[in-house]
A protein has these predicted regions:
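C-terminal segment of classical bacterial N-terminal signal peptides
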Residues: 22-32
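Bacterial N-terminal signal peptides that target proteins for export
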Residues: 3-18, 29
Length: 191
């Protein structure tokens, strides 16, 4: 009989809609984990979530972005400044820092640009690295190449330094480099 079929049909439709809402909102969803890279800017880890616009990090302005595919950190008219930690800390093997325009890195009591794997600064622009009381640029047991750009490093301690001079290499190609380390050395501790 049609009069009892209609309420059953509506009842079944309401039950189906309720089940869909439960499935959509109550069941756990899959979260996509972000990838962390061995690169820190002003104490903040660079990840797949923030790598396209690192200027959102406190202490960072201008264009700063990291491309993990070719290990390229691009600085364009950037300022990266911290009073509590390194401006840039890298453990990436083969990191290239491309400088476009004039870029300024500064720290108070920490190394400004510190890295433990080979690093190249390139790109035709200018990089000014300044630390009040630690290394402006620190090749910690690894190699530094400055290629086709201008780098000015200044510190009350070390300008551009290796760790102990046993195996670190410092290469300058078609570049202008100025280093001032008033306390301990302007360029020192390279093999």
């Amino acid at each position: 009989d049609i009069t009892t079929m209609k309420p059953n049909l509506l009842k079944n439709m309401y039950a189906t809609i309720a089940a869909l809402f439960v499935a959509m909102f109550a069941l756990p969803t899959t979260m996509h984990a972000q990838t962390e890279y061995d690169l820190t800017i002003c104490g903040t880890k660079v990840t797949s979530a923030n790598c396209n616009d690192l200027s959102k990090i406190d202490g960072v302005s201008g264009t700063v972005k990291y491309n993990p595919g070719n290990k390229l950190l691009t600085l364009q008219g950037a300022t990266i400044s911290s009073n509590t930690t390194n401006a840039i800390l890298s453990y990436i093997d083969g990191l290239m820092i491309k400088v476009i325009g004039t870029n300024n890195l500064s720290t108070a009591g920490n190394t400004t640009l510190s890295f433990r794997k080979p690093l190249t600064i390139m790109g035709g622009g200018v990089l000014n690295a300044k630390s009040q009381s630690d290394c402006a640029i620190y090749a910690n047991g690894t190699n530094l190449t400055i290629d086709n750009c201008t780098v000015n490093a200044e510190s009350g301690a070390y300008g551009i330094a290796g760790n102990n001079g046993s195996n670190e290499k410092f290469t300058i190609r078609n570049a202008t480099v100025t280093a001032i380390g008033t306390g301990n050395g302007s360029i020192c501790d390279f093999a």
